[in-house]
Amino acid sequence: MRSISFNIFVLAYFLLLIGGVKAQGDAIYRSTELDSLKSLRLKSPQRAVRYARQVLNELNPEQLELESKILNVLGEIYVDLYLPSIALQYFIDAGQKSKVRKNPWNKINIGNVYFQQSQWLEAKERYLQALDMFRRQSGQKENSVIGRAVALSNLARIERNLKNYDDALVYFKEALDVKRGQAK
């Protein structure tokens, strides 16, 4: 009896172990797909769009975070293709699918859509929201530091386009200070 219990325990352990390895393998495979998509984005945007749609069709409903990331990359592709309406829709969808409800990079991307359309005040609002979110994150997190620098640089470009040159200079200097602080 004791031997049967031990055998069942060992069998259950191995099944769990195999299941964990498979799940980890699937996660690595999906991560590779995302990396491939990002690489394709720069080389062949049309091919990247086809690949992204294929991956989206193969996703399980519980893979919302990966779906959000793929939708975000699709939005970035459409920004690069100067199709802002389509890009904006993908960024909105990505934000809704994301587990992180306040994603500052999503705000940056939406701001980029408005910037591309010369809607300076809409873009400025999104960049300010992103900057606020990045400032609330732990200060030395690399992603947070880079995000603050990007938001500040984008705000400077907005102010330059609005011909508020003094404000633009302040934002550019602050962005430079953030980047210098990161280099230490």
Name the predicted role of every residue range.
Residues 9-17:
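Bacterial N-terminal signal peptides
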Residues 20-184:
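A "functional boundary" signal
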Residues 1-9:
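Bacterial N-terminal signal peptides that target proteins for export
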